[in-house]
A protein has these predicted regions:
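Short, structured segments at the rim of ligand-binding sites
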Residues: 1-239
Length: 239
């Protein structure tokens, strides 16, 4: 194919040529990688993401290093080790690639909810990107929003709460906050999260999270079920 303009704001494709097959490796999902790195930072842990490429999310790994995580990369993937309480980082300003991705703003915010100090987030790509904030506040987070700016002041601890996902990345942020909170949190609206993450609950459980799926019964009693048709995720200590 005759394609030009890679790396610019305009890509031109000239037709007319016979195409042939090839072998191509699809690039890894950098936002999914950022989410799992922030999960380790939020709950405190050690994670290795096979196939992840730091060059695709260097602004995220830089923020995690500044927060106190040990992040290393090799030809096979990225490792993040986060054992100590995190510290606040310099202003996080979303920008087009290769700047800080707007889709990683919410999950990094979740990772910094218990950090020492205050972190300023500035959303420069989309409007209404802080819809997850009110739900995080229900879990004990200290966040002030003014227009495009959100200031996150770290707290000593988060507590469990019933919360509702209203969008994909905000829902992922609620799941990460629930990992770090005391008690069991229930997340409604998880269909938003499932739209962008394959088996998020299974992968988090594989990392040691206590996470299960529930569906409200007609009698009003919540029952657990292993099927994929779910309305709620519960994260925390099982009763």
């Amino acid at each position: 194919a005759r394609v030009s303009g890679a790396g610019s704001s305009a890509v031109s494709i000239e037709g007319g040529q016979d195409l042939h097959g090839c072998t191509y490796r699809v690039m890894p999902d950098r936002i999914a990688a950022a989410t799992y790195l922030c999960a380790a930072a939020s709950a405190g842990g050690d994670i290795y993401l096979r196939g992840a490429e730091e060059g695709h999310l260097s602004t995220v790994t830089a923020a995690l290093r500044e927060a106190g995580c040990t992040v290393t990369a090799d030809s096979g993937g990225i490792r993040a080790l986060c054992r100590e309480r995190l510290r606040a980082v310099g202003p996080v300003q979303t920008a087009p690639y290769p700047g800080f991705p707007t889709d990683a703003q919410a999950v990094l915010m979740a990772a910094l909810l218990r950090s020492r100090g205050a972190t300023v987030f500035e959303e420069n790509i989309f409007e209404n990107r802080y819809r997850h904030v009110d739900e995080l506040i229900r879990m004990g987070a200290s966040i002030r929003v003014s227009g495009r700016v959100a200031v996150v002041t770290g707290v000593e601890r988060l507590h469990s709460a019933p919360v509702r996902c209203t969008d994909l990345r905000g829902g992922a942020a609620l799941a990460l906050a629930a990992l770090a909170a005391r008690g069991s949190s229930r997340l409604g609206g998880v269909e938003f999260v499932r739209r962008g993450y394959a088996d998020l609950d299974r992968l988090l459980a594989g990392l040691g999270a206590q996470i299960w799926q529930e569906i409200p019964a007609r009698s009003g009693v919540v029952k657990k079920t292993p099927t994929k048709k779910q309305f709620c995720l519960a994260i925390g200590a099982k009763k």
